[in-house]
Amino acid sequence: MPKIKTNRAAAKRFKKTGSGKYKFRKANASHILTKKTTKRKRSLRLDQIIGASDLKEVKRLLPNG
């Protein structure tokens, strides 16, 4: 029986928190920032928690946490 492999693309994007939830960074915060408002850029700095609809798929991609 082969080992279960972690999806490396997902591993780079999602991190498991201490409480078992998964956090990720929002998109659109790396370049072309001059036309974005300060409020929008400030909200993009915050990490987000995976929603219930995506949680099952992320757990499948990251079997080892």
Swiss-Prot record:
SUPFAM superfamilies: L35p-like. Pfam families: Ribosomal_L35p. One of its GO terms (molecular function) is structural constituent of ribosome. GO terms for cellular component: cytosolic large ribosomal subunit. GO terms for biological process: translation. Keywords: Ribonucleoprotein, Ribosomal protein. Belongs to the bacterial ribosomal protein bL35 family. This is Large ribosomal subunit protein bL35. It comes from Desulforapulum autotrophicum (strain ATCC 43914 / DSM 3382 / VKM B-1955 / HRM2) (Desulfobacterium autotrophicum). The gene is rpmI.
